[in-house]
């Protein structure tokens, strides 16, 4: 399965029991290289991804400044070192899951809930971790 298929079929899929889906999603290498992304994933800066990677190494580094992606600032509401970062901006937010080699991004807006976004992103992340990725 191609990385683009993972984004299209597992991240941008319809959420069970609803007609809703994430606003944008992507799979990036921990070096910031894009493996696959949805058409509307924000154009990000390399230093924004570097800051996310640093947060996974040292949880709490993004708390004072927020998580920035494509110029949008998300307030970090939860961060587990080496695992997951969750952020909020108004009625929407972001979830980033780290695997051994990748960062999985999911961005949502209402009516999608934080829990639905977390479930989609983390389910794929856990699967990739099981596959050694």
From Swiss-Prot:
PROSITE patterns linked to this entry: PROFILIN
Q: Which UniProt keywords apply?
A: Actin-binding, Allergen, Cytoplasm, Cytoskeleton, Disulfide bond
Against Gene3D superfamilies, the record matches this protein to: Dynein light chain 2a, cytoplasmic (3.30.450.30)
InterPro entries this protein is in?
PFN (IPR048278), PFN_euk (IPR005455), PFN_sf (IPR036140), Profilin_CS (IPR027310)
Subcellular location(s): the record lists: Cytoplasm, Cytoskeleton
SUPFAM superfamilies (alphabetical)? Profilin (actin-binding protein)
Claim: Disulfide bond is one of the keywords in the record: yes
- Record CDD domains: PROF
* Recorded GO CC terms: cell cortex; cytoskeleton
Q: What does this protein do?
A: Binds to actin and affects the structure of the cytoskeleton. At high concentrations, profilin prevents the polymerization of actin, whereas it enhances it at low concentrations.
For this entry, the protein name equals: Profilin Sal k 4.0301
